[in-house]
Amino acid sequence: MIGQAIKLIEKGLVPDNLVRAGIRKLCQQRLEEESAYDCEKQSMQFHDFWQELKQSHIAIKTKEANEQHYELPTDFFYYALGKRFKYSSAYFDETTKNLDEAEEIMLEMYCQRGQFIDGQSILELGCGWGSLTLYLAEKFPNSQITAISNSNSQREHITAIAKERGLNNLEIITKDINEFEPGKTFDRIVSIEMFEHIRNYQQLFDKISSWLNDEGKLFVHIFCHRYLMYPYTEDGDDNWMGRFFFSGGQMPAADTFLLFQQNLSLDQRWLVNGQHYEKTSNAWLENMDKNKKHIMPIFEKTYGKDFASVWFQRWRIFFMACAELFGYAKGNEWMVSHYLFSKK
Protein backbone atom coordinates (compact mmCIF):
# COMPACT_ATOMS: atom_id res chain seq x y z
CA MET A 1 0.00 0.00 0.00
CA ILE A 2 2.73 2.48 0.97
CA GLY A 3 4.77 1.53 -2.08
CA GLN A 4 1.83 2.21 -4.41
CA ALA A 5 1.13 5.55 -2.72
CA ILE A 6 4.77 6.61 -3.06
CA LYS A 7 4.71 5.85 -6.79
CA LEU A 8 1.69 8.12 -7.23
CA ILE A 9 3.29 10.86 -5.12
CA GLU A 10 6.53 10.65 -7.12
CA LYS A 11 4.48 11.23 -10.27
CA GLY A 12 3.00 14.39 -8.74
CA LEU A 13 -0.52 12.92 -8.70
CA VAL A 14 -1.25 13.42 -4.98
CA PRO A 15 -2.06 16.88 -3.52
CA ASP A 16 0.42 18.24 -1.00
CA ASN A 17 -2.11 18.32 1.82
CA LEU A 18 -2.65 14.56 1.47
CA VAL A 19 1.10 13.93 1.22
CA ARG A 20 1.65 15.90 4.42
CA ALA A 21 -1.13 14.02 6.19
CA GLY A 22 0.52 10.75 5.21
CA ILE A 23 3.88 11.98 6.49
CA ARG A 24 2.35 12.91 9.84
CA LYS A 25 0.89 9.41 10.06
CA LEU A 26 4.36 7.96 9.42
CA CYS A 27 5.76 10.19 12.18
CA GLN A 28 3.25 8.68 14.58
CA GLN A 29 4.14 5.21 13.29
CA ARG A 30 7.82 5.93 13.95
CA LEU A 31 7.08 6.88 17.56
CA GLU A 32 5.24 3.60 18.04
CA GLU A 33 8.00 1.54 16.37
CA GLU A 34 10.60 3.12 18.65
CA SER A 35 8.47 2.33 21.73
CA ALA A 36 8.02 6.01 22.58
CA TYR A 37 5.11 5.13 24.87
CA ASP A 38 6.74 2.17 26.63
CA CYS A 39 9.62 3.39 28.79
CA GLU A 40 11.07 -0.08 29.45
CA LYS A 41 11.15 -1.21 25.82
CA GLN A 42 12.38 2.20 24.70
CA SER A 43 15.19 2.10 27.24
CA MET A 44 16.37 -1.28 25.94
CA GLN A 45 16.20 -0.16 22.30
CA PHE A 46 18.22 2.93 23.17
CA HIS A 47 20.80 0.82 25.02
CA ASP A 48 21.12 -1.70 22.18
CA PHE A 49 21.68 1.01 19.57
CA TRP A 50 24.15 2.79 21.86
CA GLN A 51 26.18 -0.42 22.08
CA GLU A 52 26.03 -0.78 18.29
CA LEU A 53 27.35 2.75 17.84
CA LYS A 54 30.36 2.03 20.02
CA GLN A 55 31.37 -0.87 17.75
CA SER A 56 30.92 1.01 14.48
CA HIS A 57 33.23 2.99 12.21
CA ILE A 58 33.13 6.75 12.79
CA ALA A 59 30.80 7.08 9.79
CA ILE A 60 29.29 4.61 7.33
CA LYS A 61 28.02 4.90 3.74
CA THR A 62 29.75 8.26 3.32
CA LYS A 63 29.95 7.80 -0.46
CA GLU A 64 26.20 7.21 -0.74
CA ALA A 65 25.33 10.13 1.53
CA ASN A 66 27.65 12.36 -0.46
CA GLU A 67 26.01 11.39 -3.75
CA GLN A 68 22.49 11.86 -2.37
CA HIS A 69 23.03 15.49 -1.39
CA TYR A 70 26.39 17.04 -1.78
CA GLU A 71 27.48 16.26 -5.31
CA LEU A 72 24.35 17.71 -6.88
CA PRO A 73 25.20 20.79 -8.98
CA THR A 74 25.54 23.91 -6.86
CA ASP A 75 22.95 25.64 -9.03
CA PHE A 76 20.16 23.55 -7.52
CA PHE A 77 21.00 24.76 -4.03
CA TYR A 78 21.27 28.31 -5.34
CA TYR A 79 17.60 28.09 -6.31
CA ALA A 80 16.41 26.16 -3.24
CA LEU A 81 18.32 27.55 -0.26
CA GLY A 82 18.67 31.05 1.18
CA LYS A 83 21.27 33.67 0.38
CA ARG A 84 23.88 32.11 2.70
CA PHE A 85 23.45 28.59 1.22
CA LYS A 86 22.69 27.30 4.72
CA TYR A 87 21.66 23.65 4.28
CA SER A 88 20.47 23.23 7.89
CA SER A 89 17.88 24.75 10.19
CA ALA A 90 17.58 28.52 10.33
CA TYR A 91 15.96 30.46 13.20
CA PHE A 92 12.77 32.48 12.85
CA ASP A 93 12.19 34.93 15.70
CA GLU A 94 9.15 37.21 15.99
CA THR A 95 10.70 39.81 13.66
CA THR A 96 12.00 37.47 10.93
CA LYS A 97 10.60 38.32 7.51
CA ASN A 98 12.19 35.65 5.31
CA LEU A 99 14.65 32.76 5.07
CA ASP A 100 17.64 35.01 4.42
CA GLU A 101 17.08 36.81 7.72
CA ALA A 102 16.50 33.51 9.54
CA GLU A 103 19.83 32.18 8.27
CA GLU A 104 21.64 35.24 9.62
CA ILE A 105 19.99 34.90 13.04
CA MET A 106 21.06 31.27 13.41
CA LEU A 107 24.61 31.97 12.23
CA GLU A 108 24.97 34.77 14.78
CA MET A 109 23.52 32.46 17.44
CA TYR A 110 26.36 30.01 16.73
CA CYS A 111 28.91 32.76 17.30
CA GLN A 112 27.38 33.67 20.65
CA ARG A 113 26.80 30.14 21.93
CA GLY A 114 30.10 28.82 20.60
CA GLN A 115 31.98 31.74 22.18
CA PHE A 116 33.80 32.65 18.98
CA ILE A 117 36.05 35.72 19.03
CA ASP A 118 38.41 37.27 16.51
CA GLY A 119 41.87 35.75 16.34
CA GLN A 120 40.92 32.15 17.10
CA SER A 121 41.98 29.14 15.06
CA ILE A 122 38.78 27.37 13.99
CA LEU A 123 38.03 23.97 12.45
CA GLU A 124 34.63 23.24 10.93
CA LEU A 125 33.73 19.58 10.42
CA GLY A 126 31.29 19.08 7.54
CA CYS A 127 31.13 22.65 6.24
CA GLY A 128 28.40 22.11 3.65
CA TRP A 129 28.13 24.97 1.18
CA GLY A 130 30.13 27.22 3.46
CA SER A 131 27.44 29.24 5.22
CA LEU A 132 29.22 29.24 8.59
CA THR A 133 32.80 29.08 7.29
CA LEU A 134 32.27 32.18 5.15
CA TYR A 135 30.32 33.93 7.92
CA LEU A 136 33.15 33.34 10.39
CA ALA A 137 35.79 34.41 7.87
CA GLU A 138 33.95 37.70 7.31
CA LYS A 139 33.09 38.38 10.95
CA PHE A 140 36.51 37.43 12.35
CA PRO A 141 39.15 38.58 9.83
CA ASN A 142 42.03 37.72 12.19
CA SER A 143 40.84 34.14 12.67
CA GLN A 144 42.10 31.29 10.54
CA ILE A 145 39.35 28.85 9.53
CA THR A 146 39.97 25.32 8.30
CA ALA A 147 36.90 23.50 6.99
CA ILE A 148 36.45 19.95 5.76
CA SER A 149 33.78 18.57 3.46
CA ASN A 150 33.27 15.20 1.82
CA SER A 151 32.30 16.99 -1.39
CA ASN A 152 34.62 18.48 -3.99
CA SER A 153 31.81 20.59 -5.48
CA GLN A 154 31.28 22.21 -2.09
CA ARG A 155 34.99 22.99 -1.81
CA GLU A 156 34.95 24.59 -5.26
CA HIS A 157 31.87 26.66 -4.40
CA ILE A 158 33.28 27.96 -1.10
CA THR A 159 36.67 28.74 -2.64
CA ALA A 160 35.03 30.71 -5.45
CA ILE A 161 32.86 32.74 -3.06
CA ALA A 162 35.85 33.44 -0.80
CA LYS A 163 37.81 34.73 -3.79
CA GLU A 164 34.90 36.97 -4.83
CA ARG A 165 34.74 38.47 -1.34
CA GLY A 166 38.48 38.82 -0.94
CA LEU A 167 38.66 36.38 1.97
CA ASN A 168 42.03 34.71 2.45
CA ASN A 169 41.70 33.44 6.04
CA LEU A 170 40.15 30.07 5.22
CA GLU A 171 41.21 26.69 3.86
CA ILE A 172 38.76 24.10 2.51
CA ILE A 173 39.77 20.43 2.53
CA THR A 174 37.91 17.59 0.78
CA LYS A 175 38.19 14.57 3.07
CA ASP A 176 36.18 11.67 4.47
CA ILE A 177 35.81 12.20 8.23
CA ASN A 178 36.97 8.60 8.79
CA GLU A 179 40.37 9.53 7.37
CA PHE A 180 40.80 13.15 8.48
CA GLU A 181 43.75 14.20 10.66
CA PRO A 182 44.47 17.96 10.81
CA GLY A 183 48.04 17.74 12.11
CA LYS A 184 47.49 20.76 14.38
CA THR A 185 45.20 21.96 17.17
CA PHE A 186 42.46 24.59 17.31
CA ASP A 187 40.78 27.03 19.69
CA ARG A 188 37.33 26.11 18.39
CA ILE A 189 35.90 23.13 16.55
CA VAL A 190 32.37 23.43 15.20
CA SER A 191 30.01 21.10 13.37
CA ILE A 192 26.56 21.88 11.99
CA GLU A 193 24.31 18.92 11.12
CA MET A 194 27.13 16.51 10.35
CA PHE A 195 27.00 14.41 13.51
CA GLU A 196 23.73 12.83 12.32
CA HIS A 197 25.94 11.03 9.78
CA ILE A 198 28.28 9.82 12.55
CA ARG A 199 28.03 6.41 14.23
CA ASN A 200 30.97 6.02 16.61
CA TYR A 201 30.69 9.20 18.65
CA GLN A 202 33.23 8.13 21.25
CA GLN A 203 35.91 7.60 18.65
CA LEU A 204 35.20 10.95 17.00
CA PHE A 205 34.98 12.83 20.31
CA ASP A 206 38.32 11.33 21.34
CA LYS A 207 39.85 12.60 18.10
CA ILE A 208 38.26 16.03 18.54
CA SER A 209 39.67 16.28 22.05
CA SER A 210 43.16 15.69 20.64
CA TRP A 211 42.55 18.39 18.01
CA LEU A 212 41.63 21.04 20.60
CA ASN A 213 44.00 23.36 22.42
CA ASP A 214 43.96 23.03 26.21
CA GLU A 215 41.35 25.80 26.54
CA GLY A 216 39.57 24.81 23.33
CA LYS A 217 35.85 24.19 22.91
CA LEU A 218 33.59 22.18 20.60
CA PHE A 219 30.25 23.60 19.43
CA VAL A 220 27.75 21.25 17.77
CA HIS A 221 24.34 21.76 16.12
CA ILE A 222 22.31 18.62 15.38
CA PHE A 223 18.72 17.73 14.67
CA CYS A 224 17.42 15.15 17.12
CA HIS A 225 14.47 13.59 18.88
CA ARG A 226 13.62 14.64 22.41
CA TYR A 227 14.61 11.21 23.82
CA LEU A 228 14.56 8.54 21.06
CA MET A 229 17.67 7.46 19.15
CA TYR A 230 17.43 5.26 16.05
CA PRO A 231 19.11 4.55 12.70
CA TYR A 232 17.71 5.32 9.27
CA THR A 233 17.45 2.08 7.34
CA GLU A 234 16.86 1.51 3.64
CA ASP A 235 14.72 -1.62 3.52
CA GLY A 236 10.93 -1.45 3.18
CA ASP A 237 8.64 1.02 1.45
CA ASP A 238 8.23 3.17 4.57
CA ASN A 239 12.01 3.76 4.80
CA TRP A 240 11.97 6.01 1.75
CA MET A 241 14.01 8.71 3.52
CA GLY A 242 16.88 6.38 4.39
CA ARG A 243 16.94 4.92 0.90
CA PHE A 244 17.06 8.14 -1.11
CA PHE A 245 18.30 10.89 1.22
CA PHE A 246 19.93 9.63 4.40
CA SER A 247 21.90 6.42 3.82
CA GLY A 248 23.95 5.55 6.90
CA GLY A 249 22.38 8.33 8.94
CA GLN A 250 20.70 8.28 12.30
CA MET A 251 18.39 10.30 14.50
CA PRO A 252 20.27 11.12 17.73
CA ALA A 253 18.46 11.81 20.96
CA ALA A 254 18.91 15.18 22.62
CA ASP A 255 20.82 13.40 25.40
CA THR A 256 22.97 11.11 23.22
CA PHE A 257 26.15 13.17 23.49
CA LEU A 258 25.92 13.17 27.28
CA LEU A 259 27.02 9.51 27.13
CA PHE A 260 30.34 10.36 25.46
CA GLN A 261 32.14 12.71 27.83
CA GLN A 262 35.33 10.77 28.54
CA ASN A 263 37.56 13.46 27.02
CA LEU A 264 35.10 16.31 26.52
CA SER A 265 32.92 17.92 29.18
CA LEU A 266 29.52 19.43 28.41
CA ASP A 267 29.32 23.12 29.37
CA GLN A 268 25.79 23.77 28.14
CA ARG A 269 23.02 22.36 25.97
CA TRP A 270 20.26 24.35 24.28
CA LEU A 271 17.09 22.92 22.71
CA VAL A 272 15.64 24.73 19.69
CA ASN A 273 11.96 24.14 18.90
CA GLY A 274 11.47 22.07 15.76
CA GLN A 275 9.13 24.63 14.21
CA HIS A 276 12.18 26.65 13.17
CA TYR A 277 13.24 23.71 11.00
CA GLU A 278 9.66 23.31 9.80
CA LYS A 279 9.67 26.91 8.56
CA THR A 280 13.12 26.44 7.03
CA SER A 281 12.03 23.34 5.10
CA ASN A 282 8.83 24.98 3.90
CA ALA A 283 10.87 27.94 2.67
CA TRP A 284 13.12 25.55 0.70
CA LEU A 285 10.02 23.95 -0.83
CA GLU A 286 8.60 27.34 -1.75
CA ASN A 287 11.89 28.33 -3.40
CA MET A 288 12.00 25.05 -5.28
CA ASP A 289 8.47 25.43 -6.65
CA LYS A 290 9.10 29.06 -7.55
CA ASN A 291 12.24 28.13 -9.49
CA LYS A 292 11.04 24.92 -11.14
CA LYS A 293 11.82 26.18 -14.65
CA HIS A 294 15.46 26.69 -13.62
CA ILE A 295 15.75 23.47 -11.62
CA MET A 296 14.32 21.01 -14.15
CA PRO A 297 17.20 21.42 -16.65
CA ILE A 298 19.63 20.80 -13.77
CA PHE A 299 17.79 17.61 -12.84
CA GLU A 300 17.62 16.47 -16.46
CA LYS A 301 21.39 16.76 -16.66
CA THR A 302 21.93 15.11 -13.26
CA TYR A 303 19.33 12.34 -13.23
CA GLY A 304 18.51 12.03 -16.95
CA LYS A 305 15.41 13.28 -18.77
CA ASP A 306 13.41 10.16 -17.94
CA PHE A 307 13.89 10.62 -14.18
CA ALA A 308 14.07 14.41 -13.78
CA SER A 309 10.37 14.80 -12.94
CA VAL A 310 10.48 11.94 -10.44
CA TRP A 311 13.48 13.48 -8.69
CA PHE A 312 11.85 16.89 -8.62
CA GLN A 313 8.96 15.28 -6.74
CA ARG A 314 11.35 13.35 -4.48
CA TRP A 315 13.06 16.55 -3.41
CA ARG A 316 9.64 18.13 -2.80
CA ILE A 317 8.66 15.11 -0.68
CA PHE A 318 11.97 15.35 1.20
CA PHE A 319 11.36 19.00 2.11
CA MET A 320 7.75 18.26 3.10
CA ALA A 321 8.89 15.29 5.20
CA CYS A 322 11.40 17.49 7.04
CA ALA A 323 8.77 20.17 7.60
CA GLU A 324 6.17 17.76 8.99
CA LEU A 325 8.66 15.83 11.12
CA PHE A 326 10.03 18.91 12.86
CA GLY A 327 6.65 20.59 13.08
CA TYR A 328 5.09 17.52 14.72
CA ALA A 329 3.60 18.23 18.17
CA LYS A 330 4.32 21.93 17.67
CA GLY A 331 8.04 21.27 17.39
CA ASN A 332 8.38 19.52 20.74
CA GLU A 333 9.02 15.96 19.50
CA TRP A 334 11.79 16.32 16.90
CA MET A 335 13.94 19.42 17.22
CA VAL A 336 17.41 20.96 17.02
CA SER A 337 19.96 20.86 19.82
CA HIS A 338 23.11 22.91 20.40
CA TYR A 339 26.01 21.80 22.61
CA LEU A 340 29.14 23.46 23.93
CA PHE A 341 31.90 21.15 25.16
CA SER A 342 35.25 21.93 26.79
CA LYS A 343 38.35 19.80 26.58
CA LYS A 344 38.96 17.90 29.83
Short names for language-model regions:
Residues 144-149:
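Conserved SAM-binding motif I beta-strand of class I
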Residues 118-128:
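Conserved class I S-adenosyl-L-methionine
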Residues 30-113, 117:
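Conserved Class I S-adenosyl-L-methionine-dependent methyltransferase catalytic core
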Residues 178-189:
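A short acidic, Gly/Pro-enriched loop at the edge of an enzyme's catalytic core
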Residues 164-177:
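Conserved SAM-binding strand-loop segment of SAM-dependent methyltransferases
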Residues 224, 231-336, 342-344:
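Substrate-binding/catalytic lobe of Class I Rossmann-like enzymes that use SAM or dcSAM, i.e.
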